[in-house]
A protein has these predicted regions:
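ADP-ribose/adenylate-binding Rossmann-like module
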Residues: 2-49
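Glycine-rich phosphate/adenylate-binding loop
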Residues: 7-10, 36, 40, 48-134
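Short, contiguous strand/loop micro-motifs
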Residues: 1-2, 108
Length: 134
């Protein structure tokens, strides 16, 4: 299952389910807003993801509300993210946004959002293809 939504409550529910059921092929996708470099996308455990405010909130809530481990221990939730810093839009662009974590405040680049999705899909396909049983 691929979680590619931007709603924290939904992400939390899916990630909690994946951890508790030990889902073999679950991955959550971080925020692509404000990112410009598709080649910097990575897949790791959420415990080591950086530069992603949405995943940081998810990680914090998994720890606080659902007992996920601290101290650098893996949380058993794979994620797609980029260590690239979020870039605010140029002031000359006159972008109107609500300032939330959705892309409307920062904008998004299709090459980055597509790469996030393709990486998530490829990861799930590889997990399914390499599994002896599901």
């Amino acid at each position: 299952m691929i979680d590619a939504c931007d709603q924290l409550k939904a992400k939390l529910a899916m990630s909690r389910w994946a951890r508790e059921s030990r889902a073999p092929a679950f991955i959550t996708v971080g925020a692509a807003g404000g990112k410009r470099h598709a080649h910097r996308v990575e897949i790791e455990d959420i415990s080591v993801a950086t530069h992603d405010p949405l995943l940081a909130q998810l990680r914090q809530r998994l720890r606080k509300l659902h007992g996920a481990p601290r101290d650098g221990k893996k949380m058993q939730v794979a994620c797609v993210f980029s260590r690239e810093s979020v870039a605010a839009p140029d002031t000359s662009c006159a972008v109107e946004g609500d300032g939330t974590l959705n892309c409307s405040g920062y904008g998004s680049v299709v090459s980055v959002t597509a790469t996030f999705g393709q990486c998530a899909a490829g990861w799930v396909i590889e997990r399914i293809a390499s599994a002896k049983t599901l």
